[in-house]
Structures are given as C-alpha cells and as structure tokens.
A protein has these predicted regions:
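Short alpha-helical Gxxx[C/S/T] motif in the catalytic ATP-binding
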Residues: 142, 146
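Short conserved segment of the HATPase_c
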Residues: 117-129
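Detector for a conserved hydrophobic position within an alpha-helical segment of the HATPase_c
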Residues: 149-151
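Acidic ATP/Mg2+-coordinating residue in the GHKL
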Residues: 112
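Short beta-strand/loop element within the Bergerat-fold HATPase_c
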Residues: 92-104
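Conserved catalytic submotifs in the C-terminal HATPase_c
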Residues: 51-65
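A short, conserved loop immediately preceding a beta-strand within the C-terminal catalytic
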Residues: 27, 62-68, 72
C-alpha cells in the first residue's frame, strides 16, 4: 500500500510539473523553447490517451533545437496534431515524433499509421470549422488554430497522407536565425 501511494504521488508530481511546463506558468511568455522538451511535455499531458494502445516512436535530433516562441502556443500545435492522430487511429497504432534541423529551421514531424486523409478532405483540413468528426466531438478549429500559430511564429506546415502513413511537418525558424534576422540592417530600418 505504501509503495502504491509513493507511485501515485510521483505520478501526480510529474503531471503537475508537466502542466506547469505545458502552460509556461511562472515564465516569460516569449522565450527560447527546446522543441524536444516541448514535445515531451505535450506527450506527458496526453498520456491518458496514449496509454490505451498507441505506441510512441521517438526520433529526436541530439543537439538541442531552440525556437524563440510563445511556448504554450507551440504546445497547442503539438496537442492538436497528436490528438487528431490518436483519433484517426481510433486510439490504437503507432505515433511517430521526429525532430531534425533543416538549414535555419527546426522540423517537427508527427506521423501516424492510421487510415490516411483522402485528398478531397486534405484540401480543407486547415479551414476554420471544417471537421470530419461527429457532432459534439470536434469544433473544426484545431488545425485552423495550429496553422495560425505556426504562421505567427514565421513557420510553415505541410501534410502528406496515404493509408498507413500520415505526416504533419512543421518548420520553425531556429532561435539564432530569428535573432540574426531581427538584428539585420533591413529589419532595423523598418522599425
């Protein structure tokens, strides 16, 4: 019984820590965010949906990838994409999370082995209020919000999909590239 109490206390402590990290409570709103830490915090928060049959495959670049951003907003991006992937797989399957550097950007790739997104639907997934979920199960705002947040951070998002392999790729400028651009003579002249 004592062991069970200790384990439960540890899990609660981990969840509280993850919630504080997820919301960036007690932190400045804009900061250099470690993308892998951000993804891991989101996965911890979503563990209740993942533990029912979703296997998470991680492939993270070893070098920290920092993005100057509103951290809680990026967590919302990961939440929306991961939640949709879990729903697409009906709660059972493989979720793949990958990070890598591409020139001056970090790329986050989130994929699943669900049924895929038909082309006629894929053309509309980023539109506000577009949903394929039943009434009461979705608002159709998740991917619209995701797109707006990514664009706010001067990034890009793309999706490729076929049965068994749907991938969302998010490109975000690395923190050092953002600093260089912000300090460039052309940007200073506009200010």
């Amino acid at each position: 019984l004592l062991n069970e109490i200790e384990n439960s206390t540890s899990r609660i402590s981990d969840l509280v820590r993850a919630i504080k990290e997820y919301t960036y409570m007690d932190q400045t709103p804009v900061q250099n965010v470690d993308i892998v830490k951000s993804l891991e915090t989101t996965l911890t928060i979503m563990n209740h949906k993942l533990k029912r049959g979703v296997v998470v495959q991680r492939d993270y670049q070893r070098v920290p990838l920092l993005v100057n951003s509103f951290g809680s907003e990026l967590n919302q991006v990961w939440t929306n994409i991961i939640d949709n992937a879990i729903d697409a797989m009906s709660g059972k399957g493989e979720l793949r999370v990958r990070t890598y550097r591409d020139d001056d950007c970090v790329v986050v790739e989130i994929g699943d082995n669900g049924p895929g997104i038909p082309d006629d639907i894929k053309a509309h997934i980023f539109e506000p209020f577009f949903t394929t979920k039943r009434v009461g199960e979705g608002t159709g705002l998740g991917l619209d919000t995701t797109l707006r947040i990514v664009k706010k951070h001067r990034g890009n998002i793309q999706v490729s999909s076929k049965p068994g392999d749907t991938r969302f790729q998010v490109w975000l400028p690395l923190a050092e590239k953002q600093a260089e651009e912000r300090d460039s003579p052309a940007v200073r002249a506009q200010q």
